[in-house]
Regions:
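Conserved beta-strand-loop-alpha-helix hinge in the C-terminal portion
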Residues: 217-241
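Conserved ABC ATPase "signature" region
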Residues: 115-133
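H-loop/switch region of ABC-family ATPase nucleotide-binding domains
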Residues: 197-198
Length: 271
């Protein structure tokens, strides 16, 4: 599935003294089978942008296209099944007596049989390493466990594009690594992932492409290497280290991920 935003503009409180332009003509595509990271400072428009991807917010002007079709012509429920959105701190929306009931809520809205619903629930929980949590109360879980359950509720819809808004915020290192591994697994299974993050190191580890937003506009978009080496001072630690070495050792190339940078350093050590 290809998701496109064309010249999307969004104005909050339009026509009032409090009018604010949050997006100023953003054009961006989410390609099939990719991890696209969206980065930028607080207030740059990241959350506003991703809420247009399944029309939780409707553009003031511009278009959202799903496989070339105007998204406004599609049934909203079907669009939101295909483009799943997980807000920041989604665990605050947990409500059911058990984890299984909570995760099953969304699939049940599509008249699926009980066997199909249960299969999806267990499949999504297992993907997040949380299968054993199914019978437990979500309110008795740790913060990291609650986060996994909340994400599982969206995965149970089997989206073609999964949008994650700051999914690792507040998580312990082990849970964070598990979630980043899940993102890569989803891409391998054919799901595109849009990752909103302030953490450039995690972006470097998983993103195929990076979009930088500044004051509601795209200031850069490209592969992680293209974006980060374009401005190494605003880049993850791996790129900053490599950039310092490239002046005297250009053969180090353009490593972005931690493993790539480590391999380059080992190669230099052995040279």
């Amino acid at each position: 599935m290809k998701l496109e935003l064309r010249d999307v503009r969004h104005v909050y409180a339009r026509g009032t003294p409090f009018e604010v332009e949050a997006l100023g003509g953003v054009s961006l595509a989410v390609e099939p089978n990719e991890v696209l990271a969206i980065v930028g400072g607080t207030g740059s428009g990241k959350s506003t942008l991703v809420q247009h991807m399944n029309l939780l917010l409707v553009p003031t002007s511009g278009e959202v296209l799903v496989d070339g079709v105007d998204a406004t012509t599609l049934e909203r429920s079907e669009l939101r099944r295909r483009v799943g959105l997980v807000f920041q701190f989604p665990e605050s929306a947990l409500f059911a007596p058990t984890v299984e009931e909570d995760v099953s809520f969304a699939p049940r809205q599509f008249a699926l049989g009980e066997e199909e619903v249960r299969e999806r629930v267990l499949e999504s929980l297992r993907a997040l390493g949380a299968g054993e949590l199914a019978p437990r109360s979500p309110f008795a879980l740790s913060g990291g466990e609650k986060r996994r359950v909340a994400i599982a509720g969206v995965l149970a819809m089997r989206p073609e594009v999964l949008v994650l808004d700051e999914p690792t915020a507040g998580l312990d290192p082990a849970t964070r690594e598990d979630l980043l591994a899940l993102i890569l697994d989803l891409r391998e299974s054919g799901v595109s992932v849009v990752l909103v993050s302030h953490d450039l190191d995690e972006v470097a580890e998983v993103a195929d492409r990076v979009c930088v937003l500044h004051e509601g506009r795209v200031s850069a978009v490209g592969t992680a290497a293209e974006v980060f080496y374009g401005d190494p001072t605003q880049a993850p630690a791996t790129v900053r280290v490599a950039s310092l070495l490239r002046g005297s050792r250009p053969e180090i190339g353009d490593p972005v991920r931690f493993g790539e940078t480590l391999d380059a350093l080992r190669a230099l050590q052995g040279a």
